[in-house]
């Protein structure tokens, strides 16, 4: 430990025997052994403390490395690494969409004419007026047709043929009857005046009176 050989130990023992004497040499050797044991204990304690300090230093380093590893977030690193790939994918998608979609014509710069709102009340009023006018015209035309139909005389209708009467003895009366019968249908298609009807009745009464006189 102290780099002392056997010869040196022998020299030291001789010097101690001469100086201390044979009586005091054993207790001195005991004290020397105790001192050496204490020194060895102190050295061992120092080594232990030194080893503990080294271990603590190593543990601190290990703790630092562990804390650094815990502080590191692998997901964030992966996201940072994947961001450029995502950007490239988005750019490729946009290019494909532009290539597939046809080019649209540019919008016309001329603004479209604004359509004014139609007033429904005014339209309804005009429609009602038009229907009223049409109804009034239809009523007036119907009334005119009714008036015209009423103006047509009943004499225009075909009269029933006169019944054959008994032949009289005189030929003159029969001739007059035939003449009257021939003239009557010829005048029927013509429109007679309202004053002709009493004249015909008068002629009939005269003919009847003549027949009675002849009889």
UniProtKB/Swiss-Prot annotation:
It comes from the Bacteria. The Tat system comprises two distinct complexes: a TatABC complex, containing multiple copies of TatA, TatB and TatC subunits, and a separate TatA complex, containing only TatA subunits. Substrates initially bind to the TatABC complex, which probably triggers association of the separate TatA complex to form the active translocon. GO terms for biological process: protein transport by the Tat complex. Keywords: Cell inner membrane, Cell membrane, Membrane, Protein transport, Translocation, Transmembrane, Transmembrane helix, Transport. This is Sec-independent protein translocase protein TatB. Belongs to the TatB family. GO terms for cellular component: TAT protein transport complex. Gene3D superfamilies: 1.20.5.3310. Residues 95-119, 138-215 are annotated as: Disordered. Part of the twin-arginine translocation (Tat) system that transports large folded proteins containing a characteristic twin-arginine motif in their signal peptide across membranes. Together with TatC, TatB is part of a receptor directly interacting with Tat signal peptides. TatB may form an oligomeric binding site that transiently accommodates folded Tat precursor proteins before their translocation. Residues 203-215 have a biased composition (Basic residues). One of its GO terms (molecular function) is protein transmembrane transporter activity. It is found in: Cell inner membrane. The gene is tatB. It comes from Rhizobium meliloti (strain 1021). The chain crosses the membrane at residues 1-21.
């Amino acid at each position: 430990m102290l780099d002392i050989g056997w010869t040196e130990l022998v020299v030291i023992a001789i010097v101690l025997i001469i100086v201390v004497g044979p009586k005091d040499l054993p207790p001195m050797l005991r004290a020397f052994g105790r001192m050496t044991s204490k020194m060895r204990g102190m050295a061992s304690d120092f080594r232990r403390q030194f080893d503990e300090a080294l271990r603590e230093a190593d543990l601190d380093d290990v703790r630092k490395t562990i804390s650094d590893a815990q502080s590191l977030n692998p997901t964030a690193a992966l996201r940072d690494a994947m961001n450029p790939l995502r950007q490239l994918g988005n750019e490729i998608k946009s290019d494909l969409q532009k290539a597939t979609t046809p080019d649209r014509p540019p919008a016309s710069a001329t603004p479209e004419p604004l359509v004014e709102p139609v007033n429904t009340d005014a339209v309804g009023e005009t429609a009602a007026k038009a229907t009223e006018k049409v109804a009034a015209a239809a009523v007036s035309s119907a009334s005119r047709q009714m008036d015209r139909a009423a103006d047509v005389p009943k004499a225009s209708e075909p009269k029933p043929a006169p019944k054959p009467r008994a032949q009289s003895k005189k030929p003159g009366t029969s001739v007059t009857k035939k003449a009257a019968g021939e003239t009557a249908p010829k005048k029927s298609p013509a429109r007679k005046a309202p004053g002709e009807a009493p004249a015909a009745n008068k002629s009939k009464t005269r003919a009847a009176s003549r027949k009675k006189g002849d009889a």
